[in-house]
Amino acid sequence: MAIKYIEQDRTFWLDTEHTSYLLAIVDQENFVGHVYYGQKLQYTENTPAPVYLLRTGEAPFVPSQNNRERVSFLDSFPMEYPGNGLGDYRESAISVRTAQGHVGVQLQYVSHEIVKEKPALPGLPSTFPGLSLIHI
């Protein structure tokens, strides 16, 4: 599997033999959005990633452009791993409740590292040696 990070689009591009999987970092708050999964796309240095599929240039705009539409943005943006309690009314992947009973979680991208080969797991069986791996 090939893994690339395209800095200009802030996009992760993962390719298998027949499929492509793309996710992008969006806005100043570093939301992680699902861009594409499907038939393999051809990547070239001159072709930008299809981040237009996220439709962040349309209403509801990203919070840095129009914070009044934050809830609408959170409810419609295709989060890669959606949280709960902050405006996204779809099914969440993670739910958090504090000791005081408050709910809400908003995960944000901080950094990543792409390693050349999947590390061995001591004491555990391991499959597919030699594959690239991404830590986000």
What are these regions (language model features)?
Residues M1-R10:
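Short, Gly/Pro- and small/polar-rich lid/capping loops
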Residues I134-I136:
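Conserved small/polar residues in nucleotide/adenosyl-binding loops
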Residues P129-S132:
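Secretory/endomembrane lumenal or extracellular ectodomains immediately following the signal peptide
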Residues D9-T127:
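Acidic-aromatic substrate-binding/catalytic surfaces of carbohydrate-active enzymes
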